[in-house]
C-alpha cells in the first residue's frame, strides 16, 4: 500500500541530504597554487606560484560527495624572477591579457572514511579545457580559534601536459611539457552570518 505521506517524506529526505552539504569560501590568504616545470629537458626544475586565487568548495562527508571550483588570476604568476614572469605572461606563453584566469572545476570521487582523496575535474587554461585528476595528499578541518569558524585545508596535486593547452613554448629546445600542479588550499565555512 502506498503511504499517503510518501511524497512529503521524499521531499524532506532530499532537503535533508542537500542541507548536509557544507560550503567553504576559498581563503586567498592561505591558498597558494604552485607548479613545477622543466628547463631544457631535465637540466633543472623551475618552480612558481600564483598569488591570487578565489573559489568555493562544497562537501558532504556523510554522503561522500562534493565539488570544487577554484579560479586563479594568471597575471599573478611568480617565479621570483621578473623577466621570466614577463615572458610566461606574454602572448608567447600564457597570454594573460587575453586569458586572465585559469579555472579548475571538479567533483570528489573517492573518500577514505570522511576524508576526500581524489578529485575528477576539468582545468581551463589558455582558453582550453581538458580533464585533470587531482590526488588529495592531506585534508583536515578544525575550528579556527581566531576566526571562530570551521576551516578546512588540503594539499592536492596532479600533472598535465601544457602542450595540450596550447602552451608549448620550449618544446623545440627539448623542454618537457609535463607540469606538476599543486593546490594548497584553505576554505572558511560559510555560515548564516557570513558576508
Residue ranges of predicted features:
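Bacterial N-terminal signal peptides that target proteins for export
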Residues: 1-7
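Hydrophobic h-region of N-terminal signal peptides that target proteins for export
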Residues: 9-19
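Low-complexity, acidic/polar, glycine-enriched regions of mature
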Residues: 19-195
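A generic signature of intrinsically disordered, low-complexity regions enriched in glycine/proline
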Residues: 7-9, 64
Amino acid at each position: 500500500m502506498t503511504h499517503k505521506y510518501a511524497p512529503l517524506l521524499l521531499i524532506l529526505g532530499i532537503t535533508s541530504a542537500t542541507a548536509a552539504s557544507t560550503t567553504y569560501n576559498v581563503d586567498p590568504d592561505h591558498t597558494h597554487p604552485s607548479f613545477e616545470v622543466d628547463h631544457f629537458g631535465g637540466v633543472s626544475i623551475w618552480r612558481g606560484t600564483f598569488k591570487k586565487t578565489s573559489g568555493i568548495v562544497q562537501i558532504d562527508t556523510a554522503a561522500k560527495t562534493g565539488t570544487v571550483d577554484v579560479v586563479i588570476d594568471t597575471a599573478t604568476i611568480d617565479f621570483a624572477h621578473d623577466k621570466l614572469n614577463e615572458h610566461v605572461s606574454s602572448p608567447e606563453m600564457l597570454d594573460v591579457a587575453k586569458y586572465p584566469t585559469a579555472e579548475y572545476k571538479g567533483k570528489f570521487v573517492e573518500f577514505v572514511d570522511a576524508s576526500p582523496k581524489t578529485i575528477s575535474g576539468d582545468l581551463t587554461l589558455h582558453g582550453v579545457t581538458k580533464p585533470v585528476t587531482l590526488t588529495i595528499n592531506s585534508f583536515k578541518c578544525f575550528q579556527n580559534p581566531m576566526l571562530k569558524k570551521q576551516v578546512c585545508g588540503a594539499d592536492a596535486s596532479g600533472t598535465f601536459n601544457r602542450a595540450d593547452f596550447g602552451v608549448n613554448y620550449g618544446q623545440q629546445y627539448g623542454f618537457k611539457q609535463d607540469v606538476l600542479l599543486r593546490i594548497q588550499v584553505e576554505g572558511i565555512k560559510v555560515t548564516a552570518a557570513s558576508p
